[in-house]
């Protein structure tokens, strides 16, 4: 079983079409990885599915970097 961090990074790479090595913890989805608003919505949906959790819209808007996604999932995943 891979760690939450590894799983989040794999999902980010797949959803945004970037190489996994480009997905650093400090990477911004929009500024560093080229995501647009639709990409970020799809990314949140993929994270919800992978970790069987719901991310409310007001929380999803605050998740702008890989580390923020890891932190949220770590705190809320089942």
From Swiss-Prot:
InterPro entries: ACP, ACP-like_sf, PKS_PP-bd, PP-bd_ACP, Ppantetheine_attach_site. GO terms for cellular component: cytosol; membrane. Keywords: Cytoplasm, Fatty acid biosynthesis, Fatty acid metabolism, Lipid biosynthesis, Lipid metabolism, Phosphopantetheine, Phosphoprotein. Its main location: cytoplasm. It holds the Pfam family PP-binding. 4'-phosphopantetheine is transferred from CoA to a specific serine of apo-ACP by AcpS. This modification is essential for activity because fatty acids are bound in thioester linkage to the sulfhydryl of the prosthetic group. Gene3D superfamilies: ACP-like. Residues 2-77 form the Carrier domain. One of its GO terms (molecular function) is phosphopantetheine binding. The modification O-(pantetheine 4'-phosphoryl)serine is found at residue 37. This is Acyl carrier protein.
């Amino acid at each position: 079983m891979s760690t939450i961090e590894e799983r989040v990074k794999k999902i980010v790479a797949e959803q945004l079409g970037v190489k996994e090595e480009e997905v650093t913890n400090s990477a911004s989805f929009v500024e560093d990885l080229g995501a647009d608003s639709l990409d970020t919505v799809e990314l949140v949906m993929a994270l919800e599915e992978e970790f069987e959790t719901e991310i409310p819209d007001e929380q999803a808007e605050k998740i702008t970097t890989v580390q923020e996604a890891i932190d949220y999932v770590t705190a809320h995943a089942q």
